[in-house]
Curated annotation (Swiss-Prot):
Record-given protein name: 3-dehydroquinate dehydratase
Source organism of this protein record: Rhizobium meliloti (strain 1021) (Ensifer meliloti)
MF terms (GO), sorted A to Z: 3-dehydroquinate dehydratase activity
Keyword entries, A-Z: Amino-acid biosynthesis, Aromatic amino acid biosynthesis, Lyase
Positions contributing to substrate binding: N75, H81, D88, L102, S103, R112
Name of one Pfam family that matches: DHquinase_II
Keyword Amino-acid biosynthesis recorded: yes
Role according to the record: Catalyzes a trans-dehydration via an enolate intermediate.
Protein's pathway: Metabolic intermediate biosynthesis; chorismate biosynthesis; chorismate from D-erythrose 4-phosphate and phosphoenolpyruvate: step 3/7
Active site: Y24 (proton acceptor), H101 (proton donor)
Quaternary context: Homododecamer.
Residues at the site labelled Transition state stabilizer: R19
Length: 148
């Protein structure tokens, strides 16, 4: 049975494909989920792919993933810039966590330049559109192999 990676998605990502496609691209979250599941299969993982607009739900899922998954890829969306709760939840997790963003957060508005969760994760991938998810899966593959 393959190991599982959780791919968690924060607020407004359910609107991908119609929300600011010039910034976030034209792929829907369902398109990205299909890409992730296909790539993960090639890497030897299963993917548990989830999205919520609610911070507490994301925190609950981080705790769950810390118990069930070998790694976590998270696109915290706007919560990445504000959530101390998610930062603290990630600190309590022993499996590797990779933060990702579709857009280059450092090339956008000043308030998006700082990530509250970045100090708690293994690494951050941003600016590659939907490919950011694939890069995060590869990073997690590398991190899980190193821990063996």
């Amino acid at each position: 049975m393959p190991s599982t990676i959780f791919v968690l998605n924060g607020p407004n990502l359910n609107a991908l494909g119609k929300r600011e496609p010039g910034i976030y691209g034209g792929k829907t979250l369902a398109d990205i989920e299909a890409m992730c599941k296909e790539e993960a299969k090639l890497l030897g993982f299963d993917v548990d792919f989830r999205q919520s607009n609610h911070e507490g739900t994301l925190v609950d899922w981080l705790h769950e993933a810390g118990e069930k998954a070998v790694g976590i890829a998270i696109n915290p969306a706007a919560y990445g810039h504000t959530s101390i709760a998610m930062h603290d939840a990630i600190r309590a997790i022993t499996v590797p966590v990779v933060e990702l963003h579709l857009s280059n957060i450092h090339a956008r508005e000043e308030f998006r330049h700082k990530s509250m969760i970045a100090p708690a994760v293994k690494g951050v991938i941003c600016g590659f559109g939907a490919q950011s998810y694939i890069l995060a899966l590869h990073a997690l593959k590398n991190l899980t192999e190193k821990s063996k």
